[in-house]
């Protein structure tokens, strides 16, 4: 069975946290334009959260925001938490040794914030990730 994208939280994806709500309302929300809102959120995570090289989840969304650094798993948790808090159904995507996000608005936008050269909706291959062969998930539990 195919999972539909969700706006629900998970253990490491603290959807609805007041800090996330305030950040979105103050800085990212474009009324009536979910694509622009998603793009603003993506650029924030891509540009403001430093990449750290380690395996699996160590922090989750909130701690990644606090520390302003995280690996692909923790950056995905933060981006998913912010997007879902903004009301945007979002998947986690998993390729070979790499995680990124896929917000679903009018279409699927693949968003990998781990490299400042990546663009909203158009990630490129990095850190061993394969964006051509991947699976979609509603949670990332490792």
Predicted regions and their residues:
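Short, solvent-exposed mixed-charge patches
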Residues: 1, 141-142
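Secondary-structure boundary elements
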Residues: 1-67
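Catalytic cysteine-centered active-site loop
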Residues: 51-62, 66-69, 73-76, 89-97
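Hydrophobic/aromatic-rich core segments of domains that either
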Residues: 74-141
